[in-house]
């Protein structure tokens, strides 16, 4: 009897751990159309290892139900294989958030960048919060926390703070790594991993994070039942972006937000009243001038 009880407790603890470990529902694709004459099995193994890493790692101390997992995608396009274990290419990261009381999911994050990394076939990827084991693990862990930060910010004001801080911890460790790759330093350009998390944690971007909460929780989440009220809340949230743009017109985080939401905003405000249309279009063309022609679609009659 005691053995059965112990066995039950062991199974319970293991199953609880697996539930806690599944914050992300991450689909991974590794492609290599430009790489010829290589054993394709290494890319299949890499894809499997990355998917296992993202979906099985315990990223938070919270318990997620299966339906609460955050949907995300990672696509790695290998353009060059340098030696047997070194790769060069691009990585694209996308994440989505379900909208309350609807079947619609809104894009939260969509970004693509260059990446160089080493990977040994059949070697598991293991996250270490106190050191950088490899650039691939660092990049994947960084974006796992960024995805969590973005998601949590939409459910509570600055709710993702601790996850952006964890992403910044990875930036700091990567900077001091003896094998540091590009993308981790302020000197590696103005749009990279360093600047993204710097933006999200810097006080002058508080207005963006306020917008993220208002846009999603008070806007999108109420639109199914109260479309006018939800749309008005979204319009109001955009004023926070205008405030940021006037202070930091080259904000990387603002650019990423607009890239993720541009088409959605057009769809939301096209059926709105003329006065609301005009106000929103004027605001969006100010903060996103290179896409002003796209926003004119909002003014079309429907």
Predicted feature descriptions by range:
Residues 7-16:
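Bacterial N-terminal signal peptides
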Residues 159-250, 254:
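Flexible, glycine-rich surface segments
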Residues 1-5:
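Positively charged n-region of N-terminal signal peptides that target proteins for export
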């Amino acid at each position: 009897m005691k053995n059965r009880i112990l066995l039950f407790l062991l199974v319970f603890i293991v199953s609880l751990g697996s539930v806690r470990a599944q914050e992300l529902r991450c689909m991974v694709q590794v492609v290599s159309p430009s790489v010829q004459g290589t054993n394709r099995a290494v890319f299949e193994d890499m894809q499997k290892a990355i998917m296992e890493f993202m979906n099985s790692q315990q990223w938070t101390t919270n318990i997620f139900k299966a339906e609460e997992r955050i949907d995300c995608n990672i696509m790695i396009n290998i353009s060059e294989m340098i030696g047997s274990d070194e790769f060069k290419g691009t990585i694209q990261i996308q994440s989505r958030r379900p909208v309350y009381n609807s079947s619609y999911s809104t894009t939260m994050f969509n970004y693509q960048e260059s990446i160089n990394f080493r990977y040994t076939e059949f070697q598991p990827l293991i996250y270490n919060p106190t050191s950088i084991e490899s650039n691939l693990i660092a990049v994947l862990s960084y974006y796992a926390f960024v995805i969590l930060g973005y998601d949590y910010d939409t459910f509570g004001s600055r709710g993702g703070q601790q996850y952006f801080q964890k992403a910044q911890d990875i930036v700091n460790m990567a900077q001091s790594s003896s094998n540091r790759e590009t993308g981790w330093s302020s000197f590696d350009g103005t749009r990279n991993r360093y600047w993204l998390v710097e933006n999200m944690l810097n006080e002058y971007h508080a207005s963006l994070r306020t917008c993220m909460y208002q846009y999603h929780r008070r806007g999108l989440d109420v639109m199914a039942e109260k479309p006018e009220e939800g749309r008005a809340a979204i319009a109001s949230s955009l004023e926070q972006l205008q405030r940021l743009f006037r202070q930091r017109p080259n904000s990387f985080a603002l650019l990423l937000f607009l890239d993720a939401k541009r088409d959605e905003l057009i769809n939301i405000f096209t059926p709105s009243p003329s006065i609301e249309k005009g106000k929103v279009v004027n605001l969006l063309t100010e903060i996103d001038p290179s896409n002003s022609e796209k926003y004119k679609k909002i003014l079309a009659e429907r």
